[in-house]
From Swiss-Prot:
It comes from the Eukaryota. Residues 1-12, 29-41 have a biased composition (Basic residues). The keyword Plastid does not apply. InterPro entries: Bystin (IPR007955). This is Bystin. GO terms for cellular component: cytoplasm; nucleolus; preribosome, small subunit precursor.
């Protein structure tokens, strides 16, 4: 059964008092229409008292206000400090700024991380855009050359005997005499330090003693360095105008091979080609030659330093390869090791073309010259005709040579003919024919003759039934 609903009795009319007030006879006060702004203004003027509850700020709001004030104060203080620092940098002398940067307590920089000495080079190659565009290394790759290695160079005793006639003024023991007179990296640095000490006494632009102390300590660290970070003072070394004097203070002749590798990477990536060339010339090349002379092989990290130096191919050719060929005392082992770096790394054709041109213009013959020419020819570059003409003139130059030429010379000529036989003119082939008559090898000369005279020439075609007079010499 459902619940009973109570009936609510509503009033049939308003109370009597309300009816009297609303009656027409009652007095009504006229209503004034006041705007909201005027009404609020009137209330504020009439409010003479102060409500104590409205004067108290809540704790949360007060905390927020204080935090904002504190942040604004910190920002103002930071801006003031920046302005003061800029003013100090403008007013302080350059020597004082330099001593501050070279503070020994700030040697290790936590911002930049250097890779370990044995880390792969792929990450470094990905930053190719940081290099100079003139070096042509935007597509550089630290992998095996796409042109092929060119084969292993064999060195026999007979070849060494013949080559010794072209070294040391024509004597049989010229190679040993050259090793006795060649200065090591330590000897060079000792002489440079003595010159620096003599200039330090009389020169007005002497190096700050604090800077000398810093880089002396840097050299001590590099004597035991194997991997990890390098001192910050050494990383900013290439930025100074007198970087070479500061470099000698670190004694590069006592560095570990790991230090040589890291320093080569630093100079190749953070400096221009001219500074890189100077560093390779005074540090890397003497150190590589000393290591080969002592151990009859090259340390792995020094070999990797040579590969790193090819980030700057122009600097590599000017500081390492060409000076070796021009020196006249480059051993076959040195040429073989350094030439293998050229074979394994892809190098822009323009730099290699200039190097071949310079090698072909050398008047003093050395076995290293033939080895370098052979290795560069085996890379199968599309050489300009001017370079090919220069190489032809290089081999024709030996027409007046009365001494027996080594096998390396014949192999270099064979490699050149195999790669560029169609780019040689008919007149140039006739000149080479005369050379083949005078300087003959019982195996290689026949192969050169077959490649040279049974192929197309530049501007013409060789006869199919061509016979050469040098065939009688092979019998």
């Amino acid at each position: 059964m459902g619940k009973d609903v109570k009936k609510v009795h509503k009033l049939r009319h308003d109370p009597l008092s309300k009816q009297i007030e609303e009656s027409e006879s009652a007095y009504q006060k006229p209503h004034k229409r006041v705007g909201k702004l005027r009404k609020k203004k009137a209330e504020m003027e009439n409010d003479t008292g102060i409500d104590e509850t409205e004067s108290v700020i809540p704790s949360a709001l007060s905390k927020k206000i204080l935090d904002q004030i504190r942040e604004q104060a910190i920002e103002v203080e930071v801006e003031d400090r920046k302005k003061e620092k800029q003013e100090k940098l403008l007013t302080f002398e350059q020597e004082r700024i330099q001593s501050k940067l070279l503070s020994f307590n700030d040697f290790i920089d936590d911002d930049d991380d250097d890779e370990d000495a044995d880390q792969d080079d792929n990450k470094r190659r990905s930053n190719g855009n940081d290099f100079d565009e003139n070096d042509g290394f935007e597509q550089f790759s630290d992998t095996e050359s796409q042109f092929g290695v060119g084969g292993e160079v064999e060195i026999d005793e007979e070849d060494e005997r013949v080559l010794s006639m072209f070294m040391g003024g024509g004597g049989g023991d010229g190679q040993e005499q050259q090793f006795q007179t060649r200065f090591t990296l330590g000897d060079i640095i000792e002489s440079k330090l003595k010159e620096h000490e003599s200039r330090q006494v009389s020169s007005e632009n002497a190096i700050n003693p604090k800077v000398i102390d810093v880089y002396t300590k840097v050299g001590k660290l590099l004597e035991t360095y194997t991997s990890g970070k390098i001192p910050r003072a050494f990383r900013i070394l290439p930025n100074f105008t007198n970087w070479e004097d500061l470099l000698y203070l670190t004694r590069p002749d006592k560095w570990t091979p790991h230090s040589i590798r890291v320093a080569t990477k630093l100079f190749c990536m953070s400096t221009n080609s001219k500074i890189t060339q100077r560093f390779l010339s005074i540090v890397v090349l003497p150190r590589v030659r000393d290591n080969i002379a002592e151990y009859k092989k090259l340390n792995y990290h020094l070999y990797m330093a040579l590969k790193k130096s090819l980030y700057r191919p122009a600097a590599f050719y000017k500081a390492i390869l060409l000076p070796l060929a021009e020196s006249g005392d480059c051993t076959l082992l040195e040429a073989k090791i350094i030439g293998s770096v050229v074979c394994k790394v892809s190098i822009p054709v323009l730099h290699s073309s200039v190097a071949l041109m310079k090698l072909s213009q050398l008047t003093r013959y050395n076995g290293a010259t033939s080895m370098f020419i052979r290795m560069l020819c085996d890379k199968k570059y599309a050489l300009p005709y001017r370079v090919i003409d220069g190489l032809v003139d290089h081999f024709v130059m030996f027409d007046e040579e009365v001494r027996e030429l080594p096998v390396l010379w014949h192999r270099a000529l064979l490699s050149f003919v195999q790669r560029y036989k169609t780019d040689i003119t008919k007149d140039q082939k006739e000149k080479l024919k005369i050379i083949l008559r005078k300087h003959n090898h019982h195996i290689i000369t026949a192969e050169i003759r077959r490649e040279l005279f049974f192929s197309n020439s530049r501007g013409g075609v060789a006869p199919s039934n061509f016979t050469d007079d040098t065939s009688s010499m092979m019998e």
